[in-house]
Amino acid sequence: SHLAPFVDVSRQKLRKSVIEERIESGEVLDDAIIDKITERRLRTEVQSGIQTIQYQLITLMTCNGQAPFVTVFMYLDEVPEGRTRDDLAMIIEEVMKQRMQGVKNEKGVWITPAFPKLIYVLDEDNITEDSKYWYLTELAAKCTAKRMVPDYISAKIMKELKNGDVYPCMGCRSFLTVEDSQRNADGSHKFYGRFNQGVVTINLVDVACSAEGNMERFWEILDERLELCHRALRCRHERLLGTVSDVAPILWQNGALARLKKGETIDKLLFDGYSTISLGYAGLYEMCMRMLGKSHTDPEAKPFALAVMQRLNDKCKEWKEAENISYSVYGTPMESTTYKFAKCLQKRFGIIPGVTDKNYITNSYHVHVTEKIDAFSKLKFESEFQKLSPGGAISYIEVPNMQTNIPAVLSVLQYIYENIMYAELNTKSDFCEVCGYDGEIKIIEDETGKLVWECPNC
């Protein structure tokens, strides 16, 4: 939305150029013709601009050799109705067209770039076939089927959970909390410019295994581990205290996160809700299996899982009230940590069927990958837990190649809009870097039980 006002700047510049050209060539100054030529040139300029942004982001490297984790937020209602919103729609359309095309790798094959991450907001003006911007949602569905992006935020559900606000996450799923103390000049809640101080994740499976199925002991150990996490989060917070704005002028002095003076510390930004700090959690499924012998999808285990989530939130609220630091519960992405946690559990407790017998533990509140459940039921079930992860979480559904069944993708998007705040469709978008095969590559277990890719071609 921040780019949208500049589209009309280009439009006026191009229109002036078209008029000058027609005067020089002695052609008639017909407004309809001038507007048609202007809009055609404008579309080309927007296309070129979006392509430039994409290529600059994926070729820019951070100090540790990674592409920056940038999230592009596509929300039509962030700008006023009329020309500016239509210009934003043009930008969104081009962003998705560029992503559908992909980028060429060294073999000259169009592949899916990992970044920037795209988030598309589903709202009243784009969720039904008769809505004005339905064509963008159709394009988003096609893009998802081919490139696994964008991810989707339901404006309807987010407004219910976030005091009427709709705003992007940082990276893949870290959401700021709504803070009445943080407002823009117009009185609206402030999100852009705020940040997160870091995350510490509690291994809920370890808590359950340590309790050995004893419920009273479980709650005692959980509180002990939560206090350990609290101490670790305080270490992160205190490490930032005293940092002067000079260490990163773009962030702290030039407006990316704040406009502090030279030599001023960032301390005031660490309190009063300007930034958040996250209590992550992992392994809700395995926790229930160890304590109750049932998945958290079982009606008998679900209340226990929700009670644990509520305890995490209660602790964050308690710490926040005592320290004026904005603690929040966060569904940790895990990534490599899932393997690390699993290995540590096996070392401490051995192989427990259904609990520690895999080389991973389940991400946050997610339904276990081996459970038989349809996409709609999974989203509906997980939506109850997403409410209890105010610091961020995302739900996924796994689908086959959907490029020939876009209506089915659209039906999933409409279900997301009505039922869950933030979700993503994982489809197949594989490319073998050895032989160049472009198609579905299977995941198998090697001789050690580790999940590996197996190309059907080579």
Model features per residue range: what roles?
Residues 277-290, 310:
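Contiguous, well-ordered alpha-helical segments that form the cores/surfaces of helical PPI scaffolds
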Residues 1-273, 294, 298-458:
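Conserved catalytic cores of very large enzyme subunits
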